[in-house]
Amino acid sequence: MAGTETKKITAPRLPSEVFSVEFNQSLVHQALTSYLSNQRQGSVKLKNRSDVRGGGKKPFRQKGTGRARAGTIRSPLWVGGGVTFANIKNHEKKMNKKMAKKALASILSKFKTEKRLTLVEDVSFKEPKTKLAVEFFNKTGVDSALLITSEADQNTMLAIRNLKSFGFLDAKDINPYDLLKAKHILVTHSAIPVLKEVVNVK
């Protein structure tokens, strides 16, 4: 194919610890929830009484003014004071690394079982042209897929990003969201050992 380099190597054996794991829906759901929660920015910031600057000095004396006593201008009762029960959220959801890896293996195994996972030869585009990506995917016979490679090749990434039905992912960066969103998964030969390392439960 013009503009596309394919490296022919012997097709590797699919390691059972990555592609022959029983699907665990509960574990996969937990991994997906954890991943999505950790992607949230949590940019909303409300200041409670302790977060507001100033207010170290008592605003006026305790008695003799006729006003209600006050100890600080940071009180929620004052204009410019803190917010009562400020909604300060940390969306981070931690998950045991071993469980997270098992969830990824579970997803990959499900794709293999359902015959939605295809091994392809290593590929790289000489130029970052969408046309080259279209020609490559047409040869695979799938109309929508996620291509997983051993490393993030810049030309390949740029060539694929304009295609709505196709995605590109470095094997080191696989996550439950992108995997589950895919209709079909294409895995390059050189990505197999990387995937094995990523989901390796020690």
Model regions and ranges:
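Glycine/serine-rich anion-binding loops at beta->alpha junctions
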Residues: 51-86
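Extended polybasic, low-complexity segments that bind anionic RNA or targeting/receptor surfaces
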Residues: 1-41, 87-202
